[in-house]
Amino acid sequence: MQPMEVPEIEKQIGINLYSTNTEGLGGRLRQEVEDFIVKEITNREEGKDGRYLVLELTKRDWDTHHFTRTLAKILQISQKRISVAGTKDKRALTTQKISIFDIDALEIEKIHLKDVELKVLGRSRKSVELGDLWGNEFIITIRDISSSPEETRTILEKTNSKVLTQGGVPNFFGVQRFGSVRSVTHLVGKAIVEGNFEKAAMLYIAEPFPEEPEETKAARQFVKETRDFKEGLKTYPLRLGHERAMMNHLISNPEDYSGAFSVLPKNLYRMFVHAYQSYIYNMILCRRIESGISLNRAVEGDIVCFRNEAGLPDSSKTEKVTSETVNAMNRLIKHGRAFITAPLPGFNTEFASGVPGEIESKILKELRVSLEGFNVEEFPEMSSKGTRREVLLQVEPKFEVGEDELNPGKSKTVLEFMLPKGSYATTVLREYMKVDPLQMS
């Protein structure tokens, strides 16, 4: 069977293959908000004491940051007193834990927001934080599938069989990591690592992308050609608040391109270098698959990480596989106690040896990556020493198939699966749907 062509936007972020060679379902996601259900899995149990009130939040079609901002306003408190373990998709029905510092449970009775349900779980001496999150359960409906329910079932069974045989799907970073409409974050990160802040700033502010609205493209093109930030502010839409903030900085501080990044929120400016690391990781993972090296059987030179108390891969505990340990390591991998990894390179990353190491160094050479560049002297908060990430997303989706009541004559399927934190549902769905990520929803 001919390998299926990967959409252009995925090639731009370093993904050039599917690991399954089965037919794609096509179809689309999120026709209704309830088609995408996400439930957080945490390791917390709440008690009766402590200064943090812990709640279960169920929200429909709400952005997490927008919700916490709105909640803080109603309660008349600082947004900093509200903590979550992870941000969730906006166009979805999501359930997660949140904590609020120093507030009475009775205050929650004030909250009457459309499509929001808050349930008091108890109190704690510590806030809800990222470390509490183990993973997420997903119940996802794919609609508008052209094949009949019987054909849809056959396609799903074939893909599922492939996924189970290979132990899961490649743990790629999906388009969300790079910007869905404008996959520019990794290019900005590359320029930063190369020490070229001027190029980085201009890419972020002024590089037009085909999928953007025409007036946005024209505004960006003008600034790209003229560097007239003052004039540019007149045409840049208000929704491009980050770009506008950077241009304002450059009007007041001409040529201070690294300083222009300091006006951005910390989580955004840190994302640039992380996205570049993710791009390199995706490239290395594709090359490993193309080379015919298994993702669930270690070879000599591989670096594996081990399972933590939550049963999740812990990249801080690693070991290099040798000829003496390869069989024992593969037994651990088979039982889900060890995981093969690939690098998110930085200034202090451990690299594999043997054939996996050759692949890693070859990609770094082809991309002309300077590891020292990840130590960003001009903007130390952007620096990254690097880490390693498991190459396989162990997943066993269950599915149901039926007629699509919203699209007469079409089929639908409901997929259920669990993923560890930091992984993307779309990474699983791409193997089943095989469509352009921008057309998925």
Curated annotation (Swiss-Prot):
Protein name per Swiss-Prot or TrEMBL: Probable tRNA pseudouridine synthase D
Catalytic reactions of this protein: uridine(13) in tRNA = pseudouridine(13) in tRNA
EC primary class: isomerase
The EC number(s) this enzyme carries: 5.4.99.27
UniProt cross-references to InterPro entries, sorted A to Z: PsdUridine_synth_cat_dom_sf, PsdUridine_synth_TruD, PsdUridine_synth_TruD_CS, PsdUridine_synth_TruD_insert, TruD_catalytic
GO biological process: pseudouridine synthesis; tRNA pseudouridine synthesis
Keywords of this entry: Isomerase, tRNA processing
Function statement: Could be responsible for synthesis of pseudouridine from uracil-13 in transfer RNAs.
Similarity comment: family membership: Belongs to the pseudouridine synthase TruD family.
Keyword tRNA processing: yes
Organism ancestry: Archaea, Methanobacteriati, Methanobacteriota, Stenosarchaea group, Methanomicrobia
PROSITE patterns: TRUD, UPF0024
Catalytic site positions: D89
Domain TRUD: from-to ranges: 168-393
GO MF entry, a single one: tRNA pseudouridine(13) synthase activity
